[in-house]
Design a protein with these regions (language model features):
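Bilobed periplasmic-binding protein-like "clamshell/Venus-flytrap" ligand-binding domains
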Residues: 76, 149, 154-166
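Catalytic cores of eukaryotic secretory-pathway lumenal/extracellular enzymes that build
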Residues: 15-16
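Intrinsically disordered, low-complexity polar regions and short flexible loop motifs
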Residues: 130
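Active-site-proximal N-terminal segment of extracellular/periplasmic enzymes that hydrolyze or transfer
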Residues: 135-143
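C-terminal cap/loop subdomain of S1 sulfatases and analogous C-terminal strand-loop tails that border
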Residues: 3-9, 26-35, 40-127, 158-159
């Protein structure tokens, strides 16, 4: 089974099935385990499948994967996916230490890096060869780890919750 549980950024914590039924358009029983889709992809994809144009000035982060849903191609992401799993003293750690991930992750092509916001506990996995995330190869690719760590840590710094802003 996949490593991780809910409350972790390993695949067992972030992957979920996506089941689509569209008679006469999508062949029943088809399974695609290689394409990486995310919630941000739903809007442009479902609009395309339904024949609806997105707004003229739409600038969402999602990609259109209509061809994947219709079984016409596999998908390669054009952009990286990034996750932050916030934690505090009351919430956020799976019971099994093996399933406790760093709080940031980035998926870039076949690579997945997990790391903490301070750069500690970097874990790199080749998702084409190691979908169960058993072989941390961060030590074999220090330049890639540095590049992806910088990218996800900068993303986190720009997007993290600043807390409630009030004049009171």
């Amino acid at each position: 089974y996949l490593r991780g549980t809910k409350n972790s950024l390993y695949e067992g914590g972030i992957r979920m099935p996506f089941i689509v039924k569209y008679p006469k358009k999508i062949k029943p029983g088809r399974v695609n385990n290689s394409s990486v889709l995310c919630a941000v992809d739903l809007y442009p994809t479902l609009c395309s499948v339904a024949g609806i144009k997105t707004e003229k000035n739409y600038k969402g982060d999602g990609q259109n994967y209509a061809k994947v849903l219709l079984g016409k191609s596999e998908a390669k992401r054009k952009t990286d996916l990034m996750w932050d799993f916030g934690r505090n003293k009351h919430f956020g750690f799976p019971g099994n230490p093996y399933d406790r991930s760093p709080h940031l992750a980035i998926r870039s092509g076949k690579w997945k890096l997990l790391v903490n916001g301070d750069g500690s506990d970097a874990q790199l996995y080749d998702m084409e060869l190691d979908k169960f995330e058993k072989n941390n190869i961060a030590g074999e690719h220090p330049e890639l780890v540095a590049k992806l760590s910088k990218k996800v840590c900068e993303w986190y710094a720009q997007n993290k919750d600043k807390g409630l802003q009030t004049d009171l």
